[in-house]
Amino acid sequence: MSKITLSSLKSSLQQGLKNGKNKLNQAGTTLKNGLTQTGHSLQNGAKKLILYIPQGYDSGQGNGVQDLVKAANDLGIEVWREERSNLDIAKTSFDTTQKILGFTDRGIVLFAPQLDNLLKKNPKIGNTLGSASSISQNIGKANTVLGGIQSILGSVLSGVNLNELLQNKDPNQLELAKAGLELTNELVGNIASSVQTVDAFAEQISKLGSHLQNVKGLGGLSNKLQNLPDLGKASLGLDIISGLLSGASAGLILADKEASTEKKAAAGVEFANQIIGNVTKAVSSYILAQRVASGLSSTGPVAALIASTVALAVSPLSFLNVADKFKQADLIKSYSERFQKLGYDGDRLLADFHRETGTIDASVTTINTALAAISGGVGAASAGSLVGAPVALLVAGVTGLITTILEYSKQAMFEHVANKVHDRIVEWEKKHNKNYFEQGYDSRHLADLQDNMKFLINLNKELQAERVVAITQQRWDNQIGDLAAISRRTDKISSGKAYVDAFEEGQHQSYDSSVQLDNKNGIINISNTNRKTQSVLFRTPLLTPGEENRERIQEGKNSYITKLHIQRVDSWTVTDGDASSSVDFTNVVQRIAVKFDDAGNIIESKDTKIIANLGAGNDNVFVGSSTTVIDGGDGHDRVHYSRGEYGALVIDATAETEKGSYSVKRYVGDSKALHETIATHQTNVGNREEKIEYRREDDRFHTGYTVTDSLKSVEEIIGSQFNDIFKGSQFDDVFHGGNGVDTIDGNDGDDHLFGGAGDDVIDGGNGNNFLVGGTGNDIISGGKDNDIYVHKTGDGNDSITDSGGQDKLAFSDVNLKDLTFKKVDSSLEIINQKGEKVRIGNWFLEDDLASTVANYKATNDRKIEEIIGKGGERITSEQVDKLIKEGNNQISAEALSKVVNDYNTSKDRQNVSNSLAKLISSVGSFTSSSDFRNNLGTYVPSSIDVSNNIQLARAA
């Protein structure tokens, strides 16, 4: 089929009128006789619309006439068959039998074969409106078609008395009616044909738009349209319609890449005020001319009413909305330039799609806005008359038909552009043998590396690790999702992609094959390295392991959903080697949302386990939100619960038979935590709606759940910010209470117990224990063996109870001479310069009982044998007792200074005191409640050398 152009459309429409006039002239004498006979017939039935079915055209033969008949009955349109009605087609007078509409002796006839053939001949009309054989199956399309034509002819019949017209034989009025009928036929045929030539339509619009874009300023736009060839007074109605179609090109002005958003908005307003204004002038003049011909008023007030009504019908907001679409296209195009350099042109495809569909939308918006303005003018003109103006044929009915066809055509145009996107993607995938959307994620990751490279290459220094492994989950990308939806390839997209990058000595390893990351099977292997230290950092939340599959399903007529199916793996297995590694699992998504309440809170979730085999080396593991199984292997390994709100710990190792084995129970209470949820991405391509299910991490409020971790070969546990409970084993345990009010019981063994922040209760139990209360008012018990207590400024008021052994109390950051010693009741209070007290309970109880009870024998040693300052200086329990007694229950500053000076002059003890000073200093710098990290770091300061320092303390 030949392409439709603006000029050919005008020519065709003009020819329609010309044919009408020629036929009228050619009729000659026949016209006089025919019109007289027809006039008599029309007296009884001129105001009927008839669906005419000729003899032999049977609806049972597989055509769509049966559906048209049903629709006609629904709409009250009479149905006649030739053999029943004996209709006399006025072939000799009007020769309209090859058109959809025609005059007959009983009224206006809608020819069923011609309408049926039109639908068959135009398959794209058939696809949108419904084919001739299935038209009734799609929301009553036959009703829509017949109803639209009936509306047009209803306007004709209300504005023209055909009986009177034919009887009076007024050639001017007859020409007008005939022109209207011909125009309707031509418009239906030509616009229907344009659906098959979408590219031609767009091409002609684009050509005219390119001319307009070269005009300086916007003021010349109306002149350009005014310079179109004049079709003459008799065809002014055609000029209006042609102006509407050509005026659609003004939408391209809004797409000018050189124009600012403000200029585009101004272009919309300018177009509304000037271009449509000129069309309105033509409409108004035509309406007024017809009012004069009908003997109706054409005074100034009437003209003003028409003009004002037309103006109100024009909404610049329509053009502002179009401008926003072009703005979106411009933003995406600008965004796309970077990713094109990285091997992905999907964003450019998306920008082109929005620009092309925006142009289509702009054209339709322009036409519809102009039609609304004209219809408003017609309504104003008709308001003052009892009989509507004949221009209703050219406006009210025709505009409705144009609008309907354009709306149906717009979707076909959108899909045509979408098909081009689809073909480009398929072509690329065949050439590169790779998923196109995966390439999109790859480009996003490369851009992320470029943006953050300076930060990433500094991680070796910041994290004090020779090797840093950065694992990044590229999340769902809305623009990639839009592209998949537009191209109808939603089953080919994934929820994202995970990447591994390694950094050594401040250099990025472009592809580190030594790290294995297998998302489908849940494997992370970092064991293949010759570096001594490494840090594994999950930069963004890593989704749960498993393989995704998608299925695109049609939900409604124009609605599709792509369902997500996941073959899940219930755990990650992480393998480390000989390096001393720090691994933070708090950014690994371990909970999968299963059920929600009405407020969207998670009330049921599923667990994804982490199994970590750490191998040799001194490793640090930060535990995440759910079940974790850790085998520390060789070396001194620490497990941290200090990050995230993942529940208070309950550890009971009293029955453990293997050193370093612990069962850690956690109740993660009502709060927010990372969960994997299924979200839906929605994209509209005109009337087509696409929904895509995808996975994402969601920091969602949830109800509580219980987790049990299993630890093996773990030497040290750092608690949570909640109120933890620790019960040690028969072996040496190292516990850090972290924040919260913690209860820590070392049980047997030589334990290291750190209270952290909060008012903790610490009991060393049996063994030579190292006890640090931390900040808060702590209650500390050492037991009967040789214990070491540590206090520093800011730790608060601690209460210590001891019962035997050779014990030591170290003030890690205070000189001994700056402390105050007092006897309060039977206890000893030691006060620092900040006023914080360490109270040693019942220090003097045995002495007080001995002085008051005859023959009393001491049964328990409740004293601490040495109290040590930050420089290693110390005072013994015997010296404390003597000086307290001499100082009337308090040691004077002078007496305390003398003790310190005497100790410092002792040469044979200097080496030991220096070693002990290191012990105290290291303890002072070790803050168990700290997170030991910067915003992304995982560095944990080395804890004190437990065995060596205790030996030094004992030797001291």
Swiss-Prot record:
Subcellular location: Secreted; Host cell membrane
Record-annotated membrane-spanning stretches: 233-256, 266-323, 361-406
Hemolysin-type calcium-binding repeat start-end pairs: 718-735, 736-753, 754-771, 772-789, 792-809
Record membrane topology: Multi-pass membrane protein
Record's keyword terms, sorted: Calcium, Cytolysis, Hemolysis, Host cell membrane, Host membrane, Lipoprotein, Membrane, Palmitate, Repeat, Secreted, Toxin, Transmembrane, Transmembrane helix, Virulence
GO molecular function: calcium ion binding; channel activity; toxin activity
Stored InterPro entries: Hemolysn_Ca-bd, RTX_C, RTX_pore_form, RTX_toxin/Mannuronan_C5-epim, RTX_toxin_determinant-A, Serralysin-like_metalloprot_C
SUPFAM superfamilies: beta-Roll
Coiled-coil intervals: none
A Pfam match: HemolysinCabind
GO cellular component: extracellular region; host cell plasma membrane; membrane
GO BP terms: killing of cells of another organism
Keyword RNA-binding: no
PTM info: Palmitoylated by ApxIIC. The toxin only becomes active when modified.
Domain notes: The Gly-rich region is probably involved in binding calcium, which is required for target cell-binding or cytolytic activity.
Physiological role: One of the virulence factors of A.pleuropneumoniae, which shows a weak hemolytic activity and is moderately cytotoxic for alveolar macrophages and neutrophils.
Family the entry assigns: Belongs to the RTX prokaryotic toxin (TC 1.C.11) family.
Protein name: RTX-II toxin determinant A
Source organism phylogeny: Bacteria, Pseudomonadati, Pseudomonadota, Gammaproteobacteria, Pasteurellales
